[in-house]
A protein has these predicted regions:
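N-terminal phosphate-binding caps/lids of nucleotide- and nucleic-acid-binding domains
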Residues: 18-428
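N-terminal amphipathic/basic-hydrophobic helices that include classical n-h-c signal peptides
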Residues: 1-22
Length: 428
């Protein structure tokens, strides 16, 4: 290769040599660029379900039905009762970078919707065939579109109820290599089911229904009761024992990270991290920082090599989180990561301390703190921001209500955690 020769020899070479060694820069064709973009957004059937679910939730839907066949590889349908798409906007649905959620660059600094990139529908249609039927309240007819290879191939007007139905068929029909790397149909179905579980946890006010191969493995009522959702996911016995995390009334004016949700007791451990669900401002994310804070809060309460379970709903100012990191929108960056780490750890830790005695000394080691499984109140306040001056007291009736100091809490320092979590993965 020319690059391996000394400069003096390179200068003496004839020009014909360079013609064969130089790779000219070319502008990618629309077809190739579409496939590259689609590959980042649509990795597997569950990716399609995720994008369609987020569109439905952003549209204000209160009922969402998901139907799949062959693990979503042959067909995926998502039907909602949301606002629908006005006739004037329908032709733009499958255009790349077309969205109703962002207008200016400043909007990217304060994103409040689940979707915002304007790539989902375009990317899905680039790797499958998509049929969209939609209607709105104030229009007499709705619209039907069929898109293929990123282009609309059919369009008509039909009578339809308000809401939207999207049916995706023959996923990766022109991508045999991508189909080859998909897992079994049952494994892909499992990924979709897990995804629907997650969205139902963060939106208990929405009724979800999942139909797979004509069976209904999962549904929720939309009653806005997180414990009812957990009953649908894990069963009544497990859900009834879980601990609910709520914001204390005295902290309503707090402007830092607010941690709420539901979590398992120390007896409800799992063999891996796949049952740790983290949501930031209603968005499911993967975060080593938050996951590690959640785990470390259980230190001393459960055995080593076991992992907690639960769903934490964390709210922070939108300007303190950057969700525009990756097209999949599951990776985010935090402006005040240490504050978030501390708030999560204190919220979870204090929940556990309300249910277990606080010893006068709490040596580190493999010992497991005794947990009172019978004392599980239906609701209790647990959030405690790290910057508030006063120190929480134990509300366990079995304790002497002494002040819980950092030595008792065994709270892991944020700086130490950064070093300790180098090999940590959020879901394993």
């Amino acid at each position: 290769m020319i690059g391996e020769l000394p400069l003096t020899e390179v200068l003496s070479l004839p020009l014909e040599v360079f013609e064969h060694d130089y790779m000219a820069i070319k502008i990618l064709s629309p077809e190739v660029s579409a496939r590259i973009a689609a590959g980042e957004v649509v990795e597997r059937p569950a990716s399609v379900v995720k994008e369609l679910l987020e569109n439905s939730l952003d549209a204000g839907s209160t009922r969402i039905r998901i139907e799949t066949t062959e693990g979503g590889i042959e067909s995926i349908s998502v039907i909602d009762n949301g606002r629908g798409i006005p006739e004037v906007d329908v032709p733009l649905v499958f255009k790349r970078f077309a969205t109703s959620k962002v207008e200016t660059a400043e909007d990217l600094e304060a994103i409040e919707t689940l979707g915002f990139r304007g790539e989902a529908m375009y990317s899905i249609s680039a790797v499958s065939e998509v049929e969209l039927v939609t209607g709105v309240d104030n229009e007499s007819t709705g619209s039907r579109l069929v898109a293929r290879d990123g282009e609309i191939v059919e369009q008509s007007f039909i009578a339809v109820n308000p809401g939207t139905k999207v049916k995706v068929t023959r996923l990766f029909r022109n991508f045999p290599a991508r189909r080859k790397f998909l897992r079994t149909r049952s494994a892909e179905s499992g990924r979709i089911k897990t995804l629907v579980h997650r969205y139902s946890m963060i939106r208990p006010d929405v009724a979800f229904e999942l139909i797979q191969e004509k069976s209904r493995p999962f549904s929720t009522t939309g009653s806005n009761d997180i414990r009812n959702v957990m009953s649908s996911v894990y069963g009544n016995e497990t859900a009834n024992q879980m601990l609910q995390v709520k914001l204390d009334e005295v902290l309503r004016d707090w402007r830092g990270p607010v941690v709420m949700g539901i979590m398992g007791t120390p007896a409800q451990t799992r063999a891996n991290r796949s049952h740790i669900n983290i949501f930031i401002n209603g968005r499911w994310i993967q975060s080593k920082t938050v996951s590690y804070a959640f785990e470390q809060a259980y230190h001393g309460f459960m055995a080593d090599r076991r992992f907690p379970m639960g769903a934490l709903d964390i709210h922070i100012p939108v300007e303190d989180v950057d969700v525009n990191v990756h097209p999949a929108k599951t990776e985010v960056r935090f402006r005040k990561e240490s504050d978030l780490f501390g708030s999560v750890q204190h919220a979870v830790r204090n929940t556990l301390l309300q249910l277990a005695p606080v010893p006068s000394a709490s040596p580190r080691g493999n010992s497991q703190r005794q947990f009172n499984q019978d004392h599980v109140p239906a609701t209790h306040s647990t959030f405690w921001p790290t910057s508030i001056g006063s120190i929480p007291k134990s509300e366990n009736p079995n304790s002497d209500n002494t002040i819980i100091r950092p030595g008792h809490l065994e709270v892991v320092d944020y700086a130490d955690s950064v070093a300790n979590r180098q090999s940590h993965t959020p879901h394993g």
